[in-house]
Amino acid sequence: MLELDRRCDAADPDTLVLLTPHGIHVEGHFAVVVAGRMAGALDDTPNVALDVPVDRGLATATLAALHDAEIPAVGVSFGGNVPEDAVMPMDWGTLIPLWYLGGRRDPPRSVVVVAPARDRPLAEHIAAGAAIASAAHRSGVRVGLVASADQAHTYRSDGPYGLSPRAAELDERIIRAVGEGRLQSLVDLDPTLVEEAKPDSVWQLLMLAGATGETWRPEIISFEVPTYFGMLCAAYSQH
């Protein structure tokens, strides 16, 4: 993550579009945060906390682009009924990447946070990624895209999801797909493999596939299994 932080600083985006598996879940819909800010802290670690502005202009444009692509999506907020003044709780899938990628800057980088829709077809996530990229291209600002995506969660028998040999099987396939620039191939994953390995990544990676198309070159930085789940860091640069 420190290397991704270095590269993000070098690219110096004005705002980050972040795809999180751990934000709000809306049945049958993708979700785009349209509150004025996001704030939160890690459980039991109150000193790891962030409060960042939402790029509401880009968030609104992203939502419109999803609608234009006929993808079911809703804008979501929290608390106050004036979206500009509302503060959306920040999930850990958002906080941890932002901790490294500009959330602690002064001022912090603004964000647009999008949640996938696991109950929608996998192929629709590719189309959603393309719509998100279209909105970013039209925005006139420098945008970085972050796919927050832990890998398989069944590496340890004492973990919350138990042990499955399919964890390594899935992650090996994902690593190859990322490294070879074939993220779209994940649309053909066996649902049983996904269920047994329990990744939090497939949906955001397919959105990343739609956003990057064939014009971005991947580079794997690291893959580790520090606990019961796998963690993959990769960076993309344009050809």
Placement of each model-derived feature along the sequence:
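Non-transmembrane, aqueous-exposed alpha-helical and coiled segments at domain scale
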Residues: 26, 130-139, 143
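Beta-strand elements within well-structured catalytic alpha/beta cores of enzymes
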Residues: 14-20, 141-151
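Short, solvent-exposed loop/turn segments at secondary-structure junctions
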Residues: 23-25, 152-153
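Flexible, D/E/H-enriched segments
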Residues: 1-14, 25-126, 159-239
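Short, catalytically relevant binding-site loops at active-site mouths
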Residues: 119-121, 151-154
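Non-catalytic alpha-helical scaffold/packing segments enriched in small hydrophobic residues
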Residues: 124-131, 144-147, 173
